[in-house]
Amino acid sequence: MNHHQQQQHQKPGEQQLSEPEDMEMEAGDADDPPRITQNPVINGNVAMADGHNNTEEDMEDDTSWRSEATFQFTVERFNRLSESVLSPPCFVRNLPWKIMVMPRLYPDRPHQKSVGFFLQCNAESDSTSWSCHAQAVLKIINYKDDEKSFSRRISHLFFHKENDWGFSNFMAWSEVTDPEKGFIEEDKVTFEVYVQADAPHGVAWDSKKHTGYVGLKNQGATCYMNSLLQTLFFTNQLRKAVYMMPTEGDDSSKSVPLALQRVFYELQHSDKPVGTKKLTKSFGWETLDSFMQHDVQELCRVLLDNVENKMKGTCVEGTIPKLFRGKMVSYIQCKHVDYRSERIEDYYDIQLSIKGKKNIFESFIDYVAVEQLDGDNKYDAGEHGLQEAEKGVKFLTLPPVLHLQLMRFMYDPQTDQNIKINDRFEFPEQLPLDEFLQKTDPKDPANYILHAVLVHSGDNHGGHYVVYLNPKGDGKWCKFDDDVVSRCTKEEAIEHNYGGHDDDLSVRHCTNAYMLVYIRESKLSEVLQPVTDHDIPQQLVERLQEEKRIEAQKRKERQEAHLYMQVQIVAEDQFCGHQGNDMYDEEKVKYTVFKVLKNSTLTEFVQNLSQTMGFPQDQIRLWPMQARSNGTKRPAMLDNEADGNKTMIELSDNENPWTIFLETVDPEMAATGATLPKFDKDHDVMLFLKMYDPKTRSLNYCGHIYTPISCKIRDLLPVMCERAGFPQETNLILYEEVKPNLTERIQDYDVSLDKALDELMDGDIIVFQKDDPENDSSELPTAKEYFRDLYSRVDVIFCDKTIPNDPGFVVTLSNRMNYFQVAKTVAQRLNTDPMLLQFFKSQGYRDGPGNPLRHNYEGTLRDLLQFFKPRQPKKLYYQQLKMKITDFENRRSFKCTWLNSQFREEEITVYPDKHGCVRDLLEECKKVVELSEKGSGKLRLLEIVSYKIIGVHQEDELLECLSPATSRTFRIEEIPLAQVDIDKENEMLITVAHFHKEVFGTFGIPFLLRIHQGGHFREVMKRIQTMLDIQEKEFEKFKFAIVMMGRHTYLNEDEYEVNLKDFEPQPGNMSHPRPWLGLDHFNKAPKDRYTYLEKAYKIHN
């Protein structure tokens, strides 16, 4: 019977029971229902915490938080059991655990009956966010002989949808009820469960209370970063040094040392999980960087390197090397001559191979194993020539803190991807390493104590990361699982993370250690010295506490934001200099902002405003800015007396922020006690005055006036002349600024305001100008034309198409401009000729250049920008040309690669005549590339697909026949002198390409090679070696094959003589590619280590 196979399944065909009352039998349901007896908890190994927040006595009193327990459940009258029954709860990790027992019948096998035995967790909870991983032993007690008790193991992640786990067919009913077997006595059966649970997630788990430590928040797939940070935090000597780094002048958002100080300080003092977003932000990473899963060694090195550099020149300089640096010597010793090469190197961690190794000792033995250099692999000993030698490394020193990287993740060349090795690999709590040192010190043996075990669960594509730490080096272990910290046993921390799969243990084989941290026993007290508040500089404490205070204040403001509103006060001086519609530009105006309780009254606000602005209440008047139906925004009357008791939110009509124009007396008159003139809201009107100057094409603000509604326009002319500084007899032309693009001239000056102005209201604007015939010669002679031109103005961002992410520059244009007017304006900005510019539309669906504009485009700028949304930035692209646009538009942009004389490819763009041929393309190419001094001076165009040359294009071939595609590239190269003239009878140009094992896996730079009928292949090989500049030792590893129709035939280099027919298409298959010569060798070019979603770790600050 395969117990483990069954344990992975819930009760097949049965509904999951979540409400205990549904499973209990009520009195009357049966004549004599089975009675249930709960035995007390047999044992519970309560996990003690040594943190300062609690004592061991406290933990012993509160057994509900324990990590493991054994409890029993006795069912009497067992033979009458017909329904599922549940035991009373036993609390582990403060969650209720119950034994569930049921009879199990099989419809297709009526004579077979079994006992269902399950462990249930937290089934009565309404929460859907909790989870708890546990291992358990389910046992039916044998009354006669406890050793014959029947048990099975389970391992499961309990959560709201799978809150019970066990076996539908735990034992045959007949076996349990057979008195001879010993499982039943007096019709009673006792069920027992031993459960060992991890700390739960999604419930009120107080890590500080139970362990004395806090975790780190999971801020979005930061992988092992949390595990690494906890490991570094508990390297106490490092933590002390980090605190001592001077960061007083550092930018709080960019300083890595300050961010690390902040995380360490909060881990030491906080009662709740600590966030890491400020730390990753200080690295200068994009959001994507937090999700990139690379090895922990890389992150550890760049982080410690960054901190080490920041420590230079400070009192803690050298701390990182002192803690983590060791030295090793790499040597090569010749066997038969007196020659030895040595190089001493520093290391900060050791990468240990685990594949095929039983334990850490075997890995160290493999690390220092001597490699024999003999045969084809002899060592070049200079004047001694090639010699047999021994190559290896020896450790000179081992650091106080030893980081061991276990190579769980490795590249598999067969699958061309990284894989995870889940093999069992053992490591001890105490690690003696003297045998691996070149020279030992009897007074200080290299004995190490295990301090941290970093663990990964899952495969190469993802998973979960935790770290087990021995914080004080005393064998009391804790498990740090992101935000949850819990006590754990030594076995959980060490043995359970060996990996592999042991049928006797319920440990998933994909859960195993990938990094170990050992501390030298002689340095244990020094490295783990207690870190107290006295070790933290006072100025750092004050800075971090001030940050906390500010964050708390901002948090409080966010929480109370719904109680407040903003009132934006705009003063009259903000109207001066405004050159547009209405009184001011909302995007440029400087407001005085007040934070006001929504339920406060207008009277209270006016009192506060008066005190803040320094004017008595009779020297100020409030005019809320009111949006009109025509799209303008003008001041409107607010009656302080009538509306004084109304709330601000009521008066603002829920507008937030609420903008108010604050009218005050002239500051020069304020000291004399002058007050604002009275305003009769029923008979008076407030008007604003602007003066337009056609010569400067500008507006001048001339203040505001109160005037009776019955006043005639002519009565206002003297006031306007005075405000503008004109003589009183000056003739004026008047306009009403109604709305954008609508400015009406006032014709009759002898009518009242209500008849002269359209729908007279407070805040109406009159624009006036001199009636001067000289204005007719101005570009914009009247205010009406000025506002019309203003309405057509648009800010356009011009970005250089050739510069990625170019922010560009802004030019204010009229959307009535034609192509040449736009080009002329932009050319002035760039200090170039308009004819040397080409413009491109912006793509509508994404931010980027679209189709080019022809220089004879007949539309206006408005036509080009019509698809932009009203508030969307208007953007066009340009590129500067080396020829006039009229000539350029008749050419074609042709991207290709150029193979230079050093056999290196570079991307170029040439511009041949679009109606030309390949010859024109090659001639244009000669203008932009550098040819060899002693070369042929002749070029050719090759077409390349999948790193293979598939053809040479003839010079008279039309360019329009060369269609670009992502799967093909074009390459231009200078024809070698040896290939200019080919004897077609006896010679041929063949394609040569590189591949490794599979002919479809081509790579590198393909090339053409001249071969001669009957020539020895060794001579061909020699020419290839010279062309590729490959050392003899490396070239010996190459294999050569003729590849035809996807199949390759390896050549015997010593016997093969060149036969041109081997490289000709087969008869009847002329449409297929010609056979080509393949070079089979390993691709040593650096393969992109990261996919398009990945980048190498780099801390930018």
Curated annotation (Swiss-Prot):
Gene3D superfamilies associated with the record: Apoptosis, Tumor Necrosis Factor Receptor Associated Protein 2, Chain A (2.60.210.10), Cysteine proteinases (3.90.70.10), Phosphatidylinositol 3-kinase Catalytic Subunit, Chain A, domain 1 (3.10.20.90)
Catalytically driven reaction(s): Thiol-dependent hydrolysis of ester, thioester, amide, peptide and isopeptide bonds formed by the C-terminal Gly of ubiquitin (a 76-residue protein attached to proteins as an intracellular targeting signal)
PTM summary: Phosphorylated.
CDD domains referenced in this protein's UniProt entry, alphabetically: MATH_HAUSP, peptidase_C19C
GO biological process: protein deubiquitination; proteolysis; regulation of DNA-binding transcription factor activity; regulation of protein stability
Gene Ontology terms: cellular component: chromosome; cytosol; nucleus; PML body
Main location, first listed in the record: nucleus
Residues covered by region (Disordered): 1-64
Acidic residues bias: start-end ranges: 19-31
Interaction with p53/TP53: region residues: 53-208
Any one GO molecular function term: cysteine-type deubiquitinase activity
Region (Necessary for nuclear localization): 70-205
Protein's cellular compartments: Nucleus; Cytoplasm; Nucleus, PML body; Chromosome
Domain MATH: 68-195
Domain USP: 214-521
Composition skew (Low complexity), residue ranges: 1-10
PANTHER family assigned: UBIQUITIN CARBOXYL-TERMINAL HYDROLASE, UBIQUITIN CARBOXYL-TERMINAL HYDROLASE 7
Reported function: Hydrolase that deubiquitinates target proteins, such as p53/TP53. Deubiquitinates p53/TP53, and thereby modulates p53/TP53 stability, p53/TP53-dependent transcription regulation, cell growth repression and apoptosis. May be involved in cell proliferation during early embryonic development. Involved in the regulation of WASH-dependent actin polymerization at the surface of endosomes and the regulation of endosomal protein recycling.
Similarity-based family: Belongs to the peptidase C19 family.
Protein name as annotated: Ubiquitin carboxyl-terminal hydrolase 7
